[in-house]
Amino acid sequence: MLGILEGGKAALEAKAMELSGILSKVVTIIHLPLAITGAFCTALVPAISSAISVKDYETVNKRLSFSFFASILIIMPCAAGLVALAEPILKLIYPAASSGANILILSTITMIFVSLNYVVEGGLYGFGKVHIPAIALAIGGIVKLIMNIVLISNPDINILGAVISSIACQVILFIICMYYLNKQIKLNINFKDHIF
C-alpha cells in the first residue's frame, strides 16, 4: 500500500514539474514583445516630466496618448500571432513544451495588460507618483497569491490558475493606476491623431 502511495506522489510531483516548466517557457515567450513596449515607457518618464515642469499638460496628454497607441500597435499583432500560432511556436522553440499552447494563448491577455500598465506607470512616474504603482502591485500581488492557492490546487484548472491569477493581478494594477493617472490629468486618448 505504501508503495502505491509513493508511486502516486512521484507521478504528481513529475506532472507538477512538467507544468511548471511549460509555464516558465511560456513566460519567456510572452516577455519578448514586452521588452519593446517597456523601452517606450522608459523614454516616456523624462518626456512627461519635462512637459509637467513647464505645465504643458497638452503635451503630456499627447505623449501619453501616443504611448498608448504605440503599445497597442506593437502588442496586439504580437498577441494575435501568438494566439494563432501558439502550438507551432512552442513546437519550434520548446518541443518538450508543445502541450502548453492553451497556456500561451491565455497568457497573451496578461501580455496586453502588462504593456498597457507600462504606459500608465510611466505616466504616474512622470508625475512623481511612484508610490501608486507600488501599492497597486502589492494589492494585485495579494489577490494573485490567493487566487494561485485556490485555482492551482483545483485539478480541473491546475496550472492555468497561475495564468488566470496573473491576468487578475494585471487588471487590478491597470484599474488602480489608470484611476490615479486620470486624477492627475484628464486623459484624452485619441488614436485618430496618430493614424492620420
Predicted region positions:
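C-terminal transmembrane helix end/exit motif
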Residues: 1, 167-196
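Alpha-helical transmembrane segments of polytopic membrane transporters and translocases
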Residues: 11-37, 69-70
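Interfacial segments at transmembrane-helix termini and the short loops linking adjacent helices
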Residues: 14-17, 65, 83-112
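Interfacial transmembrane-helix starts/ends
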Residues: 24, 44, 56-73, 77-85, ...
